[in-house]
Amino acid sequence: MASDNALPSAAPLISVVVPVRNEAPNIAPLIAEIRAALVGVVHEIVYVDDGSTDATPQELAAARAVGAPLRILRHRASCGQSAAVITGVKAARGEWIATLDGDGQNDPADIPRLLARAQAEAVKGVPVLIAGHRVNRRDSTVKRFSSRFANRFRAWMLRDATPDSGCGLKVFSRALFLSLPHFDHMHRFLPALTLRAGGVVISEPVNHRPRVRGKSNYGTLDRLAVSFLDLIGVAWLQRRGKRPVIEPEA
């Protein structure tokens, strides 16, 4: 087994993909938590810096210099969270992918449990997405209310049976993700896209923590406006997707 202090020489079981933009104060603490959560698991950590203008690149370089199993990818200019996730998953070497936000609000300690559930479901032969569900959210009242409204409206439109599609903590196979359509803001619709592809979505309760360092790079109204437009597009995709049942060759 590879050392926890270096990238594994063989393909890791899981790649933890973390998209970040201007999260310098959260880099070192979150990487330490990811490493602690995955002790004994062959893993890599893939950070995608989405055009940060603060000290995020320097903090990432410092973390790698002290031995973190870390890969660093960088967008020259900000392209958005979904683009960063896509970049990270494409570069990842693990069979399984865990995504989480870079602000420290998702708890890496939940990753092993979600991974175990994904592996247990995978033996059934159907692609699976394990989606985190932030049961006790530690956000402002405005953010909680807007998220609740958006989740209910999305569930009504897409029938994705997911109470918290916006949770950044998810576990899925790399193969599943690469088979999905890729577009801006797709990370918000992974459950619906997985169902459209014939997969299964399972929501698991996860810990959620208040942001203690830095500030959000996205405004609530901006998220709502963008999500509504994308929602229409995903609904369009759903209604035009067909999965034929192919009979055995004669």
Question: Which residues fall in each region the model found?
Answer:
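Terminal low-complexity segments of carbohydrate-biosynthetic enzymes
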Residues: S3-A6, L229-A250
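Conserved donor nucleotide-binding strand/loop of the catalytic core
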Residues: H43-V46, P57-A91
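Short, well-formed alpha-helical segments that are part of the catalytic scaffolds
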Residues: E23-A37
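Cell-envelope/extracellular polymer assembly enzymes that use nucleotide-activated donors
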Residues: L13-S15, E44
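Conserved sequence signature across two-component system core domains
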Residues: V20, V48-G51, H75
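A conserved acidic beta->alpha catalytic loop
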Residues: D49-Q58, G104
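Acceptor/aglycone-binding surface of glycosyltransferases and processive sugar-polymer synthases
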Residues: L73-A91, W96-T99, Q105-H185, L193, ...
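Donor nucleotide-sugar binding loop of glycosyltransferases
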Residues: E23-N26, S52, Q81, D107
